[in-house]
Amino acid sequence: MKLCVVXVLLMLAMPFNGGEASRFFNQHARSQRSGMKTRGIWCDPPCPEGETCRGGECSDEFNGDLGG
């Protein structure tokens, strides 16, 4: 019984770890490569309000694009 539960948990976890996570990180890598502006969540520490993360650094040069 216990073995069966473990197998089911593994089967549930595998698609997420393999698919979702890799897609998430591939998306990030693609946006960094192409130079698209990315949100501050990629910067550490996060950018201040109104600044944009670009290549891991904060920049306010995109303020005009944000409609404010």
From Swiss-Prot:
Tissue expression notes: Expressed by the venom duct.
Subcellular location(s) of the protein: Secreted
GO cellular component: extracellular region
GO molecular-function terms, A-Z: ion channel regulator activity; toxin activity
Post-translational modification note: Contains 2 disulfide bonds.
Prosequence residues removed at maturation: 21-68
Keywords assigned: Amidation, Disulfide bond, Ion channel impairing toxin, Neurotoxin, Secreted, Signal, Toxin
Domain comment, as recorded: The cysteine framework is XIV (C-C-C-C).
Listed name of the protein: Conotoxin Cal14.13c
The organism of origin for this protein: Californiconus californicus (California cone)
Lineage: Eukaryota, Metazoa, Spiralia, Lophotrochozoa, Mollusca
